[in-house]
Swiss-Prot record:
GO terms for biological process: prosthetic group biosynthetic process. One of its GO terms (molecular function) is triphosphoribosyl-dephospho-CoA synthase activity. This is Probable 2-(5''-triphosphoribosyl)-3'-dephosphocoenzyme-A synthase 2. It catalyses: 3'-dephospho-CoA + ATP = 2'-(5''-triphospho-alpha-D-ribosyl)-3'-dephospho-CoA + adenine. It comes from the Bacteria.
Amino acid sequence: MMPIPVNPTNASIQPQSLYDAWADLAWRAMLTEVNLSPKPGLVDRLNCGAHKDMALADFHRSAEAIRHWLPRFMEYGASCTRLPPESVLAGLRPLGMACEAAMFRATAGVNTHKGSIFSLGLLCAAIGRLYQLRQPIAAETLCATAADFCRGLTTRELRQNNLQLTAGQRLYQQLGLTGARGEAEAGYPLVIRHALPHYRALLAQGRDPELALLDTLLLLMSLNGDTNVASRGGADGLRWLQQQAAVLLHQGGIRTPDDLVYLHRFDQQCIERNLSPGGSADLLIVTWFLAQISQVNH
């Protein structure tokens, strides 16, 4: 892929063109994930997976609505560099909620990308902060900055004992799953240590990009304590899905178009069990986005 041309004459006075280029990558990451097919239990070009309330067009409309908010996360990240990183999240929340409202308006109330608003919002704010501080913008630095933003998040939001537990608190208390919050606070280790190196290695070997991304999704599904899956199928459902993904990888993964038959079968099994690995889908979006981040010249 050729680098995305930006060529600012003076980066300090032309950040907006850079922000738009990075936002375009994040938008493309959302589209790349939902169009990827076949995906076990997830909405794709072939079916709606284990979902009865959403379809492909909902995701396209959602991504378009979110797209316009992404530069605002970057602008906020750039505007608060004097704040300690752990103080940034409080200011990001109103932006995230407004972005969610735009998503819900676009989809008539369907939650298509709430997890991605959280992860991409964090990473876009990290881009703004690092750019303003003249620090390297790369997968590792972005994830480390996002982790700094989220310092103490799981303790504050998952370990407190409310009378009415949220879904995330319930899954944490019952199964020890920290979900999107825990992954962000840890600096996205499933992406940095596993999915991103795996995806890059497959591309370096000449693997078809779509097959490489499907194989990377399987890797994430095999490792991720996906709260979306656990909320639908409990510990047993999560364990089954992780094991099925691991078996497919052990058998060679998705190397050729002929291997797609195994994914079609896995998809039908997930639909029958009403399991949808939405958390892994969100991490796949992060993986693709970070894999492309160097394409923007800055």
